[in-house]
């Protein structure tokens, strides 16, 4: 009887290994497509689904493993925590988990599509229905310029924060939130503070918007937790 050879060994060369949990048919298809389109160096630097390329760990795999998701989501609901822990390599990395947004694409999928379309630094990606800015975050991580547009002001806020937060200065953020009581009082006012409305280039605006998004996330969670199903989802 002929010895059985696992599918992965049939598809990929020796010392190439997929990221744990890559088992859906569409994921295998995208991983193989990346493998066929990208060079070995590009696979190491850009691949969404490969863990090892000729024995070398990919940037995506190493980046995801740098995060302590248990600590990041220690105050999240059980469902949210499990969602991002299970999606460590697909949904829970970088700034994608800053605000839960239903209906968004898996970031890992978007990264693979950018690779398959051979979009590289120097190109510009346009996303006319940006939602939670998944495309812009992935483009940013790959060194690609992007333009995101959405009719929703909230999606605009979310997208700005998720891209800004990729390289924010932690000490500056800490200095803004150190007086949390005063900041919360400003956020709870009916009139939005001026620094959220200014159109001028203000370096601190991104930090204030980051705090605002965190506040809205916390308020939303508190509201959902203290309300009945009928109130949250009226028929």
Give the label of every model feature segment.
Residues 1-119:
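S-adenosyl-L-methionine
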Residues 92-96, 138-140, 195-196:
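Short acidic, glycine/Ser/Thr-rich loop/turn "cap" segments at secondary-structure junctions
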Residues 99, 128-129, 148:
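Alpha-helix N-cap/helix-initiation motif
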Residues 121-131:
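Conserved class I S-adenosyl-L-methionine
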Residues 133-137:
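Glycine-rich SAM-binding Motif I of class I
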Residues 141, 145-148, 152-235:
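Class I S-adenosyl-L-methionine-dependent methyltransferase module
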């Amino acid at each position: 009887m002929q010895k059985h050879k696992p599918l992965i060994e049939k598809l990929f060369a020796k010392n190439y290994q997929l990221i744990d949990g890559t088992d859906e048919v569409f994921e295998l298809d995208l991983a193989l497509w990346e493998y066929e389109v990208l060079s070995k160096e590009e696979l190491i630097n850009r691949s969404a689904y490969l863990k090892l390329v000729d024995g070398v760990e990919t940037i995506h795999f190493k980046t995801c493993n740098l995060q302590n998701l248990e600590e990041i989501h220690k105050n999240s609901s059980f469902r949210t925590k499990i969602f991002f822990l299970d999606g460590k390599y697909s949904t829970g990395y970088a700034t994608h988990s800053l605000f839960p947004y239903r209906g968004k694409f898996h970031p890992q999928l978007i990264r693979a599509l950018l690779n398959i379309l051979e979009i590289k630094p120097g190109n510009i990606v346009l996303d006319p229905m940006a939602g939670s800015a998944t495309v812009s975050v992935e483009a940013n991580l790959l060194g690609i310029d992007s333009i995101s547009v959405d009719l929703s002001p909230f999606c605009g806020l979310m997208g700005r924060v998720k891209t800004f937060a990729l390289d924010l200065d932690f000490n500056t953020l800490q200095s803004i939130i150190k007086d949390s009581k005063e900041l919360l009082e400003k956020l709870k006012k009916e009139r939005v503070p001026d620094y959220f409305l200014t159109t001028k280039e203000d370096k601190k605006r991104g930090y204030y918007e980051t705090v605002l998004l965190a506040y809205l996330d916390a308020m939303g969670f508190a509201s959902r937790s203290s309300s009945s199903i009928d109130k949250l989802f009226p028929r």
